[in-house]
Amino acid sequence: MKRVFLIVLDSFGIGSSPDADKFNDVGSNTFGHIVEKCFLGEANVGRKGVLCIPNLVKLGIINAAKESTGQYPLGFNYSSNVIASYGFASEISSGKDTTSGHWEIAGVPVLDDWYYFKEKQNSFPESLLEKIIIRSELTGFIGNCHASGTDIISRLGEEHIQTKKPIVYTSSDSVFQIACHEEFFGLSNLYKLCKTVRFILDRYNYKVARVIARPFIGNDKLQFQRTGNRRDFSIKPFATTVIKKLIDEKQGQVIAIGKVSDIYGGIGISKNIKSTGLYELCSTTIHEMKKALNNTIVFTNLVDFDSNWGHRRDVSGYAKGLELFDSRLSEIISLVQKNDLLILTADHGCDPTWIGTDHTRENVPVLIYSPGIKKNFLGHRKTFADIGQTIAKYFLLTDMSYGQNML
C-alpha cells in the first residue's frame, strides 16, 4: 500500500533564498528569527522560553535550517537522532505567493509573472471595478488600496455595514481580496461576488492568482474579527499537477484539507475537507491518515502560521503555533507505515520579525519520513518541484516536466 501525507506549514521559511535580493528579502529567516526571539525571552506572550519542538527536531528541521543558512538556529546544535531525510528547497517561480509555492510543490512552477495591482491607492482600475459593479448590481466599493486585512476591516467595517459596499483591497501578492460582514452582507453573497470577480478577471485576461473572500463578524471596529469562512477562488493550474496525475493515471484519491482545494481551483481533488484552526486541521489530518487507502495523498495546508502570525508579525503566536503542531506531530509520525511517505514543507516565508506585512522569499524545509526508506541528507533542492517529481516516482506515474526525484 502506497500513501503520501503532505503537510505544508504555510510560510515556514528557513532562510532567505539565493534570489532574495530581487524581493528585498535578504536576511529574512522565518524559523531562525522565531528561534532567536524565543531564546532571548522576547516571545513570551501566551508561551514562555526557548522554542520546544522535539518532533520537528527529530525530523531534521535544525539540520535543514543549518544547511540553508550556514549556521544553526540560536540555542540549537547538530541533531544526531534524526529519523527522516532532510534538506531544503529554493523556489523557481517568479513570485513568493501561496499559489506559486503550492503549484511548484505539485510540479508546476509559475515562471511567468502574475498580474499585480501595484498602486498603493486606487489599486484596482476603475474600468475593472465598473464591470464588476454592473454584473453584480452593486452600488460601489470602498477601500481599493493595499492594506492589511485586519486593519482595513477595523477602519472601514462600519462604513461597509452602513452602505453595504464591499471592502476591496490587495497586497504585494497577486490577489483581489474582498471583505464583507457575514450577517449584514451575507456569506453566500460574498462567495457569489468573488465568483463574479474571478470570472471577469479571467475573461479580460487579468492573470490574477487568487480572489479571496474575507468574511468578518462583529458590531463595531472594536469587535470586528475575521472568521474561518475564508475562501480562495484561484486561477486554474495551466499544466497537470502531480495530484491530478494520481487521479488520472492510478485512479487514486487526493484528500484536500484546509485551503488546499481552493489553491488548485478544485483540480486534482477527490475530497475537499474544510477545517479551520491549527488544532482542528491537525485532528482532521490524523483522522484522514487513519482512513487513507492505497494510492492516496492526504494533503494539508496549515494556514494559521501565515495568516494569523506571519502577516501579523506575531512572533509569540507563531512560536506557540509551532509548539502546538509539534505536540500533534508525534501521533502523525506514529501513523506512517512502512511504504508511506510523510512530507513536511512550506510554500514561502513570512518572517514575523521582517519589515512590512508581506511574504518573504525564503528557502523551505523538505523533511521526508518513512520507516521503509533509508534516511539521508537531501541537499539543496533547486526547485520545490522536486517534491512533485518524488511523489510521481513513488506512485509510478509518468514524469513531471520539472523537478528531480529525491529518493
Curated annotation (Swiss-Prot):
Q: Where is the signal peptide, in residue numbers?
A: none
Cofactor(s) named in the record: Mn(2+)
- Which is an annotated GO molecular function term of this record? magnesium ion binding
Tell me the InterPro entries matching this sequence: Alkaline_phosphatase_core_sf, DeoB, Metalloenzyme, Phosphopentomutase_DeoB_cap_sf
Q: What positions does the entry give for Mn(2+) 2 binding?
A: D306, H311, H359
Pathway annotation: Carbohydrate degradation; 2-deoxy-D-ribose 1-phosphate degradation; D-glyceraldehyde 3-phosphate and acetaldehyde from 2-deoxy-alpha-D-ribose 1-phosphate: step 1/2
GO biological process, any: 2-deoxyribose 1-phosphate catabolic process
One GO cellular component, as annotated:
cytosol
This protein's UniProt keywords: Cytoplasm, Isomerase, Manganese, Metal-binding
Cofactor stoichiometry and binding remark? Binds 2 manganese ions.
Return any one Pfam family short name.
Metalloenzyme
Does the keyword Isomerase belong to this entry? yes
Q: Where does this polypeptide localize?
A: Cytoplasm
> Where does this protein hold Mn(2+) 1?
D10, D347, H348
Q: Which HAMAP family match?
A: Phosphopentomut
> So what does this one do?
Isomerase that catalyzes the conversion of deoxy-ribose 1-phosphate (dRib-1-P) and ribose 1-phosphate (Rib-1-P) to deoxy-ribose 5-phosphate (dRib-5-P) and ribose 5-phosphate (Rib-5-P), respectively.
- Name it: Phosphopentomutase
Q: Which organism is it from?
A: Buchnera aphidicola subsp. Acyrthosiphon pisum (strain APS) (Acyrthosiphon pisum symbiotic bacterium)
